[in-house]
Swiss-Prot record:
It holds the Pfam family tRNA-synt_2. Residues 193-196 are annotated as: Aspartate. It comes from the Bacteria. Its EC number is 6.1.1.12. This is Aspartate--tRNA ligase. It comes from Stenotrophomonas maltophilia (strain K279a). L-aspartate binds at E169, R215, H443, R484. Homodimer. One of its GO terms (molecular function) is nucleic acid binding. ATP binds at R215, D216, E217, Q224, E477, G529, I530, D531, R532. It catalyses: tRNA(Asp) + L-aspartate + ATP = L-aspartyl-tRNA(Asp) + AMP + diphosphate.
Length: 583
């Protein structure tokens, strides 16, 4: 139906007859001549229809937005070059136009940017927009480049099951009723974690998969119910073996897909250092602001909000200096306090130093002149700055001060251009869940501890460090991995520390424990979020822009109207009865 793509018609084709097919982007009838911007996935070319070709002119004059056309014509140099178009030096003089399909009146035009609900309801129209085409192509190029790179490095692309066993990995499972086994259910995989470990036991050595994963969790801009990850696993490796390989891979992929040259060597930072300096386990290093601990300077003050945490081994008092922040009004300071409150802050103390050196602070009265001056000097504050203070439990203070750091960086234009990758390592093995009164795994239950001795792990569970690692880019965790537990006795001990008894462990993970018993090699791996990397490459804040058919934050597919009710007959086949929802 066509000989060339619209967006690839150029000067080399001048004088030649071409057949094109695409959509009417714009049609303009200027009396003696009609101009049609014909669009396909490669771009737009101008089609010109002259009035002396009456039959073709009549067709052109009747066209509407998004009508589907086949155009035959001769390529000619344009009198008025359009430098904004790739095809702007040529036009196609139409000799025949066939309308392949008329488009109904549109809910929005390809050049408009309607609300997200409208875009998702008519996703097929939204995806026609050039910007959406660009972002989807970025994703396609990313996946192609990853596959090519891993195939060349000897990795084996192995599929793992979609219908599998429900196992706890931190989020709620999507359950699928098993019709042939009444009352029993499959679960959709949250990740291929256990299968890829078993593939290492099976001797496949280097595995990868572009895997679909499912987690029934609350949605936001960087979360979806179903998502795609590059899953990788290596046998007989230590942390640096995995990190060095994937660092080289990510560097090569960014260069190939978006022509970005990442650092020759990614910096490394322990989890403890990241939390201390940046209040985040995925710090955005493009923002130069850092948290400063001030407990030693405030522990003897008369301000109880500070003295309590400052004299508590598990407390923290931290400061954040914002250059130029003295320009903040009282209302704006209150907005910062409200932002911190979302992350657990109960208040936000501050010191504001005007350009003339005048100090405004609600906490100054609780300090002697000398101790207050020492505090200001310690945080490096000068004229024109504001300093925010957070006090409380160590982790909570780190969280809300880290959130303030990000907000201040954006508000004050302190986010540097470019790319800032790093490795975050040495994560805590466990964290204490106050609600459940037990330890939970910070990464997942299959991450190896840094110690090999089970007695040591049991005795020091609270401070145990894992062999986990995350790759962070511009404040986004793009990949997370670890060295895995390969000894069955260590895996059983970790289950025990997590409050998973022997009977429960056998019921949920018996197949894994059995596999580890039959000669499991030391192994480790990593998983990268394809959606998130594609969004970063495409320059969009929301992963929904790089997913062809995403769900809304309300967990709905507006185009297909999913989820939707199921008729009783279908429910009966899978032995399910829906009970009315009660408040």
């Amino acid at each position: 139906m066509r000989t060339h793509f619209c967006g690839l018609v150029d000067e080399t084709l001048i004088g030649q007859t071409v057949t094109l097919a695409g959509w009417t982007d714009v049609a303009r009838n200027q009396g003696g001549v009609c101009f049609i911007d014909l669009r396909d996935h490669e771009g737009i070319v101008q089609v010109t229809v002259e009035v002396d070709n009456a039959e073709v002119f009549a067709v052109a004059a009747s066209l509407g937005y998004e009508d589907v056309l086949q155009v035959e014509g001769v390529v000619r140099a344009r009198h008025a070059v359009n430098d904004k178009m790739r095809t702007g030096k040529v036009e196609v003089i139409a000799t025949a136009i066939t309308v392949l399909n008329k488009a109904a009146p549109l809910p929005f035009h390809a050049h408009e940017n309607p609300g997200e609900e409208t875009r998702l309801k008519y996703r097929y129209l939204d995806l026609r927009r050039p910007e959406m085409q660009r972002m989807q192509r970025t994703r396609i190029k990313l996946v192609q480049a990853l596959r090519r790179h891993l195939d060349e490095k000897g990795f084996q692309d192995i599929e793992t099951p979609i219908l599998t066993k429900a196992t706890p990995e931190g989020a709620r499972d999507f359950l699928v009723p098993a019709r042939m086994h009444p009352g029993e259910f499959y679960a959709l995989p949250q990740s291929p974690q256990l299968f890829k470990q078993i593939l290492m036991v099976a001797g496949f050595d280097r595995y990868y998969q572009i895997a679909r994963c499912f987690r029934d969790e609350a949605l936001r801009a960087d979360r979806q119910l179903e998502f795609t990850q590059l899953d990788m696993e290596f046998a007989f490796v230590r942390e640096r073996d995995v990190q060095d390989f994937v660092e080289d891979m990510i560097r090569a992929i960014f260069k190939e897909v978006v022509d970005v040259q990442l650092d020759a060597s990614f910096p490394r930072m322990t989890w403890a250092e990241a939390m201390r300096r940046y209040g985040s386990d995925k710090p955005d290093l493009r923002i130069a602001l850092e948290l400063v601990d001030v407990a030693e300077l405030v522990k003897d003050s008369e301000f109880p909000v500070f003295t309590g945490p400052a004299n508590d081994a598990e407390g923290r008092v931290a400061a954040l200096r914002i250059p130029g922040g003295a320009s903040l009004s009282r209302k704006q300071i209150d907005e910062y306090a409200a932002h911190a409150a979302k992350y657990g802050a109960k208040g936000l103390a501050y010191i504001k130093i005007a350009d003339n050196g005048e100090i405004s602070s609600p906490i100054q009265k609780f300090f002697s002149e000398a101790s207050f001056a020492a505090l200001v000097a310690h945080v490096g504050a000068g004229n024109g700055d504001i300093v925010f203070f957070g006090a409380g439990g160590y982790n909570k203070v780190s969280d809300f001060m880290g959130a303030l750091r990000l907000k201040a960086g954006k508000d004050f234009g302190l986010v540097a251009d470019g790319w800032a990758p790093l490795w975050v390592t040495d994560f805590p093995m466990f964290e204490w869940d106050e609600e459940e009164q037990r330890y939970v795994a910070l990464h997942h239950p299959f991450t190896a501890p840094a110690v090999d001795d089970i007695a040591d792990l049991r005795a020091n569970a609270r401070t145990a460090v894992s062999r986990g690692y995350d790759m962070v880019l511009n404040g986004n965790e793009i990949g997370g991995g670890s060295i895995r537990i390969h000894r069955p006795d260590m895996q059983s001990a970790v289950f025990e520390l997590l409050g998973i008894g022997a009977e429960e462990a056998r019921a949920k993970f018996g197949f894994l424990l059995d596999a580890l018993n039959y000669g499991a090699p030391p192994h480790g791996g990593i998983a990268f979020g394809i959606d998130r990397i594609a969004a970063l490459m495409a320059g969009t804040e929301s992963i929904r822009d790089v997913i062809p058919f995403p769900k809304t934050t309300g967990a709905q597919d507006l185009m297909t109207d999913a989820p939707s009710p199921i008729v009783d007959a279908q429910l009966a086949e899978v032995h399910i009865q829906v009970r009315p929802k009660t408040n």
